[in-house]
UniProtKB/Swiss-Prot annotation:
Family annotation (Pfam families): Porphobil_deam, Porphobil_deamC
SUPFAM superfamilies given in the database record: Periplasmic binding protein-like II, Porphobilinogen deaminase (hydroxymethylbilane synthase), C-terminal domain
Summary of subunit composition and partner proteins: Monomer.
Pathways involved: Porphyrin-containing compound metabolism; protoporphyrin-IX biosynthesis; coproporphyrinogen-III from 5-aminolevulinate: step 2/4
Record's keyword annotation contains Transferase: yes
EC number(s) reported in the record: 2.5.1.61
Protein name per its UniProtKB record: Porphobilinogen deaminase
Key words of the record: Porphyrin biosynthesis, Transferase
Family annotation (NCBIfam families): hemC
Reactions performed catalytically: 4 porphobilinogen + H2O = hydroxymethylbilane + 4 NH4(+)
Amino acid sequence: MGNLVIGSRGSELALWQANHIKERLKKECFIESEIQIVKTKGDKILDTPLNKIGGKGLFTKELEELLLKGAIDLAVHSLKDVPVVFEKGLDLACITKRADVRDTFLSVKFPDLMSLPKGAKVGTTSLRRSMQIKLKRQDLDTESLRGNVQTRLKKLECGEFDAIILAEAGLCRLEIQGAKYRKAFSVEEMIPSMGQGALGVEMLKNHKHFATLQKLNDEESAFCCHLEREFVKGLNGGCQIPIGVHASLMGDRVKIQAVLGLPNGKEVITKEKRGDKTKAFDLVQDLLEEFLQSGAKEILEKAQLF
């Protein structure tokens, strides 16, 4: 049998992720593999904010189509990009140990968000980040920032933005300092996206190596990420919707923090639940119920208009 084929997007970060899985497959599963680069819709359309492109799976659909055809054996994703409902026959074979989940502030001139002058331009791809920035600083101008990590940093250095917000995990993986000023938000200051910091490996469920990849699975990270994905699924949300959710374990206890609102920060719901790990999925349902009672569906419908 030939090498397994790993499907990956072509950015430096995506290829770091694919190579990370390739190395672990060889070392831990004794499986040789090769990487095939695939351009997704989200990679091709760079002049439009992600939420305006429309559809789910902007960074995964083309990879999933190749999985279903058998043209590739596995697809490596940033888990935060993976839709909560899979195409029939596909599923996550594993979720890797989570890297840093936090979002990070970067600027050439200003040390942190609160030091930015009124009307300063902040670049982000994410409505979730925009919402939480506006919640703290309604006077700031949040604008869409597309492209790979290096492209976004160049736009900051050229003065197109006063500050930008990126995922800390990506900066760490690429060993990028980023800018003169770099400060990670705490989870309490900016609740991350579902699955942020983790990689998800997607395969056909009936693939002969599907179970083998459980060797790469991190039990705690997978448990927390599945809780987060269950919350987003309950709201019919996707990765381009302004929802943040983060689950964490402290021994046999679990904490789930969530935020949802309009990108302009005008209507926002923030709640958290704590409880026994054995009842974690019940806690998610309780949290969902509280969000729905607080008008979550109506807010998400309004958010679609932004």
